[in-house]
Amino acid sequence: MPRENRKRGKKHKKPKEEESFGQQAHQEQQYFEPEQPVENGEPSWIRPAPRDQDDFNPEAPFGYVDQDVKAYFRTVDVQIRDWQENAVDDGNEDNDPNEEKRLFFVAALNEMREKEKQLATDPDCSVILERMAHSMDDFVRRVFVDSLAGSFEILAKHRFASHVVQTLFVIARETIARETRGFFPKMEGQEDSGELRTLTQLTLDICEELLPNLSSLVLDPFASHVLRALFLLLSPNTAAEEDNILRSKKSSAWKAKQGSMKSLFADNKGKQKEDTRRSVPAEFTNMSRRFIQELRTNLSGNEVRAMAASKVASPTLKVLLGVEAELGLSDEPESLLDHVTMGVISHTHSGSTTLPEASDFVGTLLRDPASSHLLEAIVSRCPESSFGTLWQLYFKGTLARLAAHPVANFVVAKAIERASVEQLQDIASELEGTWNKNIRTSRTGVLRAFIERSAVLNAMEKETKQAVQSAFGVESADANLIHCILTVLTLEDYKAYKAEATSKPKAQRDGNQRHRRGNQQDSDPLAFKTQGSILLQALLKLPEPQINFVLEALQQVPVEDKIKICHDPSASRVYDAFLENANIPSKAKRQWIMELIGHYHELVDDRIGSRVADRCWAFCDTYLKEKIARSLFKYESQLAGSFYGKFFVRNLNLHLLQRRPEEWRNMQSQKKIQAEQAQARNQRSSKPAPAAVNGTPGAESDATAPAKPAKRKRAKADNEIEELFDATLGRKIKKAALGDGIGATSENKETPKPEKAKKKDKSSGEDPSLAAVFGAIKAAPKHDDSNPKKKKKKRT
């Protein structure tokens, strides 16, 4: 299918041939039907011009894009994607690498002028506008949003333009955050064009435009996700999982096929996790309050509950409940939360001691695949007093059935995350005989939430251990417990599958082992599963008295199985949690690392295993590091040829350990101290420094990102020999070196030259460590070239 005919979104079913043929015949019959004579005194051959019954075209409400313009923007899209995917640094510092991109982008913006609405509603160009929006600076974003002003209701309901508006709301957060701090771009030569509103004011005007028809927009299949992005813009602290809220799985999969959506001018390499808590203007909080009050006024309780049951409106209502809780309006009668929970908030404020009657509507939400996400937000956001009522009405007494339900078990797990000690006791008593059934159906969420909540409250030590042993059918803390948890199998099933795998021919077992990491993981019942890894990581978060049975089981695992666990992408995270948890005694960690000595050459010869080995190396002290390094002497050449092991061996610096062990120990001790200091600096929270705003595209894209440590070249002081030279002779940088020429010149000027008369006295105050280094240099052979140059024979 040609690209211009492709459309994004849900496809409509084609009408049957008979119906289309009948409609076509009917239209032809209407077209050739003789017209009635006009009774206006004019001749019969004078006919009035045909009038269009409906001039508004919902597919192109602002007109179609010219084919030449569309072809031009296809070229723009191809060029932008090529620059993003094949970024090449020419290495010329004299030329601006973004100059060509900037000129190209400005030309595309000029071509887009006065065609913004047509391009936004076009099936092909809407995606191109989304890609270009990420590269716009603050000023261009304001101009682009201002060009769409007055038509946002139509655009929000449009199949393609709604995605453009949603993208604008997402990228507007950075600009609004800068405007809140008082940073505005310079507008040169724009005095005659009138006053351009700030993006903050434009957002408020958009809200005023959408506010009268809010009730209908929430139920619109295209405008609902636009409202979600708008609510998250007005109240950014509402939800952390913004991507899951804004897009469905189908939309996210389609978006991933469109390539990278990032700024063309910003370097996002090494970008840290974005801070979700931003400062917003006070007007945004008031506007959020107006949205909540508008829905409360115009919607009845039945209409709110209809939204909760709708696949389109339920995700938007989930965001609205988060905004309502953020504003502190949830704990009020007739609130949105009160309507969805069938008056639980009103009953709490009435002061009645008797429980209200349980509602079948809430019970339906528990088991509905779409609405259960809304109920998860309710049990997480509702006030503490209302949560107790919800627990008594809908969870207590029915936990065994809900935990086994394929949908309701997720809501139960979310409710357990805020349960009290008394409620945990109810869970342990009700699910005492059903843990094993949940494991057989691979539903581990309730057990994981129970373990994590027990760790937070530091309670239910005996019940937690009994729940784990009952779930997997393991009586003692041995290696089978770890294998059963990682494979999410009961002990009976694990032994049966293991016996079946042992009876197979060796060639077939080797084939299954090779494919274990691929898509055939589900076909192998003994493969490690992500659910089991997460469950075991939750067990490792328990306090020390409760975690002892897990540590005993980990110690019983054979070394060969430990290597397999370290080589698995999901199961290896267990040992990451094991080394990072401060509640686990250091003695247990050292014992686990010592057991791997003699097998590190197998561990590091793998993509995942080398990462685990780096974790172990970072935890070890100098004594353990030396034992690990000496165990790899005979495997040095083997690991040097390994694709993954060579990096680990290079970090060990085995040559220095063989020649000068004491110097190697000092170097490792110093690296350990530097790593601890760097970790302490990273843990200190620092406020992000505001970046200067200029008029270049993409200059402000990372201004609101959290403060990151400046990327520095690896300091030469890491090498002890360089340190000794710097401490004794001072740092001397040649003019041809790749350093700061100004700094090098100043240092050379400040460093006094030693006098020749004091040359003899210098040896008396010489650093002994430096003398040892000079002695080693003198003792080294002068001709140590591996490939000495051959002398040319003279012609005779």
UniProtKB/Swiss-Prot annotation:
UniProt keywords, alphabetically: Nucleus, Repeat, Ribosome biogenesis, rRNA processing
Any GO molecular function: RNA binding
Classification via Pfam families: PUF_NOP9
Region spans: Disordered: 1-61, 501-526, 665-719, 737-796
Subcellular location: Nucleus, Nucleolus
Chief location category: nucleus
Chain intervals with Basic and acidic residues compositional bias: 501-513
SUPFAM superfamilies: ARM repeat
Intervals holding Pumilio repeats: 111-146, 147-185, 209-247, 357-392, 393-429, 595-630
UniProt-listed GO biological process terms: endonucleolytic cleavage in 5'-ETS of tricistronic rRNA transcript (SSU-rRNA, 5.8S rRNA, LSU-rRNA); endonucleolytic cleavage in ITS1 to separate SSU-rRNA from 5.8S rRNA and LSU-rRNA from tricistronic rRNA transcript (SSU-rRNA, 5.8S rRNA, LSU-rRNA); endonucleolytic cleavage to generate mature 5'-end of SSU-rRNA from (SSU-rRNA, 5.8S rRNA, LSU-rRNA); ribosomal small subunit export from nucleus
Ranges of biased composition (kind: Polar residues): 21-30, 666-686
Skewed-composition ranges (Basic residues): 1-14
Function summary: RNA-binding nucleolar protein required for pre-rRNA processing. Involved in production of 18S rRNA and assembly of small ribosomal subunit.
Protein name, UniProt field: Nucleolar protein 9
Gene that specifies this protein: NOP9
